[in-house]
A protein has these predicted regions:
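Surface-exposed loop/turn positions within WD40 beta-propeller blades
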Residues: 32, 40-41, 71, 80, ...
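Short loop/turn segments that connect beta-strands within beta-propeller blades
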Residues: 4-8, 47-51, 87-91, 133-137, ...
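Residue-level detector of Asp-centered blade-edge/turn motifs that repeat once per structural unit
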Residues: 29-33, 68-72, 115-118, 156-159, ...
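Residue-level "micro-hotspots" composed of small/polar
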Residues: 17-23, 58-62, 93, 97-111, ...
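Conserved beta-propeller blade signature
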Residues: 1, 34-37, 73-76, 120-123, ...
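Sequence-structural signature of mature extracellular/luminal beta-sheet repeat domains
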Residues: 1-6, 25, 29, 34-37, ...
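Glycine-centered loop/turn positions within well-structured domains
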Residues: 1, 11, 43-44, 51, ...
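Hydrophobic alpha-helical segments, especially N-terminal targeting/anchoring helices
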Residues: 3-4, 29, 68, 77, ...
Length: 325
């Protein structure tokens, strides 16, 4: 739709062969003043002389985003057909995912394209994030430890990547721990829409979800840096709670430092909790029974189970992170 802002008059444009109900996902004007439209049936170029859009017949995949890089290449993100590039000499080239080739596009389902603060081309895909290296003509995967690799949108602000996913929003700063935000942090929901991210002129970031828009100032997003203490809340022997004052436990758990069991009392369950009450659903734990576990066991659960323990002396260790990890 083209609207005259002075009069409010509107004009609807369709591409050749496009049904009236077809979706358009993106409009982009490149440096050559060409006007492109990304639609359900591919990419379309506006013909100013004929006042209509013409379909690019080279590909028909659903096209969701269009961006131009500093070299004058126009990139088209498709959902299923990978990336198409139109260079400054009007030569087309397709980039697709190749199995077992780490230098290829990480997924053919591309949700969003972003030109970085130094001119880099990033592609957020259904299987993670990658960067195009123009000097080599290859892609480099950017490994981000997130609950979902379905990255729907990407916004870069002051060197920090904010990525919407199918399981919340990820804050990624190279060299620092990844931080996850979800509905427990105030988001409308955890499911976000492809190519629905925006960095506004006032610095606010917008992400579109299946339940409306979420917006925030990045500098106001504070990280909880207080490591929470952890309390042992219960110990069970063969599935039954051990009570204070019993043969096994002289004092209450909050005051006890040891548990005395006979050699045949060898199946125990230990429950614990982080004393952090800001979004406690996001607390994470690591525990280890010295003499049994060689390494820390990381979990979202707050319970450790041990069966058939040999006779001996053991030390149970547990630690936790808060809602911001």
């Amino acid at each position: 739709i083209r609207m005259n802002m002075a009069t409010g008059a509107q004009q609807v444009f369709l591409t050749d062969g496009m049904a009236s109900g077809s979706n358009a996902y993106c409009i982009y004007r490149d440096r050559k003043k060409r006007l492109w439209a990304a639609s359900m049936d591919g990419a379309n170029l506006f013909d100013a002389g004929q006042q209509k859009f013409s379909k690019i017949k080279l590909f028909k995949s659903l096209t969701i985003d269009i961006k131009e890089d500093p070299q004058g290449n126009v990139w088209f993100a498709t959902q299923g057909g990978g990336l198409w590039r139109l260079d400054k000499n009007n030569v087309w080239k397709q980039y697709k995912h190749v199995e077992n080739d780490s230098t290829s596009l990480v997924s053919d389902l591309v949700n969003c394209l972003v030109i970085g603060e130094k001119g880099q081309l990033y592609a957020a895909t259904g299987d993670g994030l990658c960067e195009f290296l123009p000097s080599k003509g290859i892609f480099r995967r950017i490994s981000i430890d997130a609950p979902s690799q379905d990255f729907t949108s990407l916004v870069i602000s002051q060197g920090v990547m904010w990525i919407s996913t199918s399981k919340g929003i990820v804050k990624y700063t190279p060299g620092e721990p990844v931080q996850l935000f979800n509905k427990y942090d105030g988001l409308t929901c955890n499911q976000f829409i492809p190519n629905a991210g925006l960095l506004a002129s006032d610095g606010r970031i917008y992400f579109g979800s299946t339940r409306g828009f979420n917006c925030f100032y990045p500098y106001l997003v504070k990280i909880n840096q207080v490591a929470p203490p952890v309390a042992i809340t219960s110990v069970e022997l063969f599935g039954q709670p051990i009570e204070a004052g019993s043969d096994q436990l002289e004092k209450s758990l909050s005051h006890a430092s040891e548990l005395n069991l006979s050699h045949n009392e060898n199946t125990i369950n230990i429950s614990f909790a982080a004393l952090s009450y800001v979004s406690p659903e996001k607390n994470q734990y690591a525990y280890k029974l010295e003499g049994v576990d060689k390494d820390w066991i990381y979990t979202h659960e707050h319970r450790a189970n041990y069966t058939n323990l040999p006779a001996g002396t053991y030390t149970f260790l547990v630690k936790a992170t808060n809602n911001d990890g």
